[in-house]
Structure formats: structure tokens, C-alpha cells
């Protein structure tokens, strides 16, 4: 009987000795579960860093390319900026297509540097009753849609940058200016047409007025009053040799 008890005790001890060791009994230098987790996290972090660096290397040329283009069409404008716009002028137009002809249907030229828009749009001057009576303009003027105005003088006599293209609601709009200027400072040899050259000196000159346009202020778009050509007038002065 005692022999059977000794046999059972020895078998029990052998079973305990052969059982798997717990994590607390792992020798120093053996990789525990926490060490494996840390190693796995570190490898994952390194993989993410490598992936990010690779993505940045692929994106860097594209960003540099965008900076080299420097297109004003990349400037995104908040639509709320147009809700705050006041003192609107019919001579300033934002459109995705070439602007319409002048309302009085006078000779209008549409000018642009791009090949797709490099064309002239002209309409014949509508016959007006006053022209049949022999009436003529004192000065000859020409009206032009300006599509590439980049610089202008503001109301404080400062040179400002005018936005040509803007990105509004994922659409590219151009800013057009309808300008009028003199065709010739001396339509007739004596100066302005119809003046008495015996008593008056005269010449035609282009005058300007202020319109509210979208300009760049630092890195932001803002409204400013700028000067544009709007009329052709006759300037006269009395000849002093008659006194």
C-alpha cells in the first residue's frame, strides 16, 4: 500500500515538473509576450513611417510642379466673398466664358494672350438717327474687354495685384474689365473734331474711374477700388496769342 502511495506521489511531481512554465518564470533574456508585442508595434510603426516617406517622395514632385505652374486658377475664393460685394460696376465681369458684346452694340474687341481666346469679336455699329444728321463724336474711342489685367493702381495710389483667374465652387472664372480709351489723341490735325482751332488748343485724352475688383492682399483675395480706362474726352485750352 505504501509502495502505491509513493508511486502516485512521484507521478504527481513528475506531472508538475513537466507542465509549461508561466510568463513570470521565463528566464531573463527570453522574449516574453509583451516584448513580442512591443517588437511588432515597433515594426508596424517603422512600416508606417517608411510608407509615409515613400508617399511624400511621390507627392513632392507634384507639389513642386503645382508651385512652378503658379496658376491663379489654384486660388480658391470663398463664395461668401461675393455676398459681401458692394458698389458693383457693369464694367467688371466674372465669367467662365467670353463676355457678351457691349450693350450699345458699338465696336468691341475681345483680346487675350491665349490661343483659344485670341480672337476679335466685332459688331457693326448700329445705325443711329443722329449719325444721319451729320453729327460726329468729338473724339474717337474704342472699347475693349481686357482679360489679362494683372496690375492696377488702387484708390490710395498703390500698385496692387489683380486676380485674373479664380477658383469658385470648383469652377475657374476669369475677371474681365470693359475699358474705353481714345483711339487717337488727334482725330483731326487741329486736335479734337469740331473745335475752333483759331482760338482753342485741343486734344483727346483717356480718363479713368474707380471700379471694385478682386485683388490679392498677401495670400488672401480682397475687394479693392482700382483705376481703369472708362472714357475718351476732349481737353481744350484757350490760345494765349489772341490776347
From Swiss-Prot:
UniProt keywords, alphabetically: Cleavage on pair of basic residues, Disulfide bond, Glycoprotein, Growth factor, Lipid-binding, Metalloenzyme inhibitor, Metalloprotease inhibitor, Protease inhibitor, Secreted, Signal, Toxin
Name of the protein in its database record: Venom nerve growth factor
Tissues where this protein is expressed: Expressed by the venom gland.
Pfam families cross-referenced by the UniProt entry: NGF
InterPro entries assigned: Cystine-knot_cytokine, Nerve_growth_factor-like, Nerve_growth_factor-rel, Nerve_growth_factor_bsu, Nerve_growth_factor_CS, Venom_nerve_growth_factor
Positions bearing carbohydrate: 148
Region (Disordered): 45-66
Start-end of Basic and acidic residues biased regions: 46-66
Propeptide: 19-125
Annotated localization: Secreted
GO molecular function annotations of the record: growth factor activity; lipid binding; metalloendopeptidase inhibitor activity; nerve growth factor receptor binding; toxin activity
